[in-house]
Amino acid sequence: MGQCGITSSKTVLVFLNLIFWGAAGILCYVGAYVFITYDDYDHFFEDVYTLIPAVVIIAVGALLFIIGLIGCCATIRESRCGLATFVIILLLVFVTEVVVVVLGYVYRAKVENEVDRSIQKVYKTYNGTNPDAASRAIDYVQRQLHCCGIHNYSDWENTDWFKETKNQSVPLSCCRETASNCNGSLAHPSDLYAEGCEALVVKKLQEIMMHVIWAALAFAAIQLLGMLCACIVLCRRSRDPAYELLITGGTYA
């Protein structure tokens, strides 16, 4: 019965180590996705510390690949030292992922205030020229999120760009995709996106942070199972002389 439990634990442990390799790739992808998306929205969110969970999640992903390798070798070879190292590293990574989850929730709560403060500045500096990074960021967000202005398209009337152009129109990025003849004129509001960008940017950034949180939680649960199986094998190996002889190839006298 005990040997059956050991075999089952070892089988699950080897399978989990294979999952760790897949998890390593997924975590690195999630972290990279956060970096790429942040680059598109960085003008609306000035707190670079928001990227800390993404940096940690990429580091955890790289470490999980190494953990999977150590775990497979230690499990197959029945190495007590290897399994102990495996459990300790898994525990450290588990704690790190808990920290990622906490940081994720902290920064997710800060998103709304950060965006509200930053988006006002960005819209005020809009000048409609392609070389200007802030202007490109606004046009990109309005096209991607199908929005116009901070709260709605009327916000453009309070910008310096609108007052300087004096043509009673908003940027072409405010035009609906279905409005083929749209020139941004406020005289044809039905051609413009009605929803403001602030709420949608906040929603997008919070969704990104939730991807990090859920990824960390999911793989933390898998790591708990891995630690449990490794501990079962370790404890059985330490307490059962017969099992020790079976591993080393010895026999009873």
From Swiss-Prot:
Localization of this protein: Membrane
Entry-linked InterPro entries: Tetraspanin/Peripherin, Tetraspanin_animals, Tetraspanin_CS, Tetraspanin_EC2_sf
Parts of the chain on the Extracellular side: 33-50, 107-212
Residues listed as glycosylation sites in the UniProt record: 127, 152, 167, 183
Entry annotated with the keyword Hydrolase: no
Major subcellular location class: membrane
Self-association and partners: Interacts with claudin-11/CLDN11 and integrins.
Protein name: Tetraspanin-3
Organism of origin: Homo sapiens
